[in-house]
Amino acid sequence: LGTNPLTFGMPTDEPFPFMLDCATSIIQNGKIEYYARIGHDTPAGLVIARDGSTLTDSVQILKDIRSQKAALAPLGGLGELFAGYKGYGYATVVEILSAALQSGIYLKDLEGKDENGKIRPYHIGHFFIAIDTEAFMGSEAFKKTAGNILRELRNSQKAPGQDRIYTAGEKEYDVWMFRKDKGVPVTEAVQKEFIGLRDELGLTQFKFPFEK
């Protein structure tokens, strides 16, 4: 199974919608790639090896996943004790709905290679549901109720040491508001990747803004 994300978007009466976009695995490749770029280990328990051990070396994890020597743990964690069966079940639901409704490929066929190891095009299925809120209580009533729920959640009792409660999509909205004016930060590791790619393509006459 892949990360098989579940994504929900709902309008509210606030400046931003409720937006939940999450993998059915406990972590996704992009996060591990980020850890590798900044030289950090991946927290234990998020990636499992074939022998059942957990892996933490971010660079090695990426290699092992590509060679099918490692897998991402399901949402909830490893084993029944931490309810990993829930993430496994959610991932299976996405797999079925994305394949069975439109003859999409699934499981091992998603490797992008045929039985002889030859690269072939992906035929990935997707599954969408759109709900016309106007057909129920009306779009404005929906937005108001959704907004009230989010505000009540944010105003609920906070955990010790926490000064704020977020709802899904709120952090991303805050980041977008900041970066649309201030720009997107580029880590030193990514800068090196950009420079290496430019040099490899023979475009050394061009300079990046972060180069001195």
Task: Report the location of each language-model feature.
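Structural beta-strand/beta-sheet cores of well-ordered domains, especially the beta-sheet scaffolds
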Residues: 4-6, 16-18, 43-44, 71-73, ...
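Glycine-rich beta-alpha junction loops
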Residues: 24-27, 79, 133-135
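Secondary-shell segments that build the walls of catalytic and ion/ligand-binding clefts
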Residues: 40-106
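Short conserved micro-motifs at the rims of enzyme active sites and ligand-binding pockets
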Residues: 31-33, 85-87, 139-142
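Generic structural "secondary-structure junction" signal
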Residues: 2-3, 10, 22, 34, ...
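Catalytic-core signal marking the mid-to-C-terminal active-site face
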Residues: 96, 101, 105-212
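Phosphate/diphosphate-binding glycine-rich loops and adjacent basic-rich segments that engage nucleotide
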Residues: 1-65
